[in-house]
A protein has these predicted regions:
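Class I S-adenosyl-L-methionine-dependent methyltransferase catalytic core
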Residues: 1-183
């Protein structure tokens, strides 16, 4: 859910939406950001919970899933939240993403779309193709890959550090948006 940008757009476009996050700060920021008047009949629900267990959503009831999960152990969004996958090692992160993919498949209607934005990471100078690992997890759960969009990133917080010649490696200046369909 982050700061609620997708939920704000849904409200402005008169769409129903459910936003979830494990981080209480993100929840409160989103709640504040959604507190504006506009003519809408949309239903906007926000929940403090993990995408690994969205028990309150019925099977085959969601039209579209859009998600941008945190990456494994890169930017930590909390200190001790046991549901925060940003705190996990790559191996545990991928296990958590398998649960997210299962739940996403369960709640999404057939012939509808799931879009997930995720990028690769670098640990100790070694590239970890996290995006493709996550893509394969979603495919293994039954999703059909329809498209891959490469989103270029600009003005990243640590770009100046990366550009430094002494580090001698290519920038990770993109993320993938994987477009899946549930058949």
């Amino acid at each position: 859910m982050g700061s609620g940008t997708t939920l704000i757009e849904a409200k402005l476009l008169n769409r129903n939406i459910i936003g979830i996050d494990v981080n209480e700060k993100a929840y409160k920021i989103t709640e504040k950001n959604l507190n504006f008047e506009c003519k809408t009949s949309s239903h906007i629900h926000i929940r403090l919970c993990s995408a690994e267990n969205i028990y309150f959503i019925k099977n085959n009831s969601i039209d579209c899933i859009c998600t941008h999960p945190p990456y494994a152990n890169i930017i930590k969004y909390s200190k001790d939240n046991r549901y925060d996958i940003s705190l996990l090692s790559v191996e545990k992160y991928l296990l958590a993403m398998k649960n997210v993919a299962k739940e996403s498949y369960r709640v999404l209607k057939s012939n509808h779309i799931c879009a997930i934005m995720v990028g690769d990471i670098r640990k100790k100078g070694i590239l970890i193709p996290l995006g493709f690992y996550v893509m394969n997890i979603f495919k293994q759960q039954g999703f059909i890959l329809k498209d891959i969009i490469i989103k270029e990133q600009h003005n990243c917080k640590s770009t100046s550090k990366w550009v430094n010649i002494k580090h001698s490696f290519y920038l990770l200046a993109h993320e993938y948006i994987f477009i899946f369909e549930k058949k």
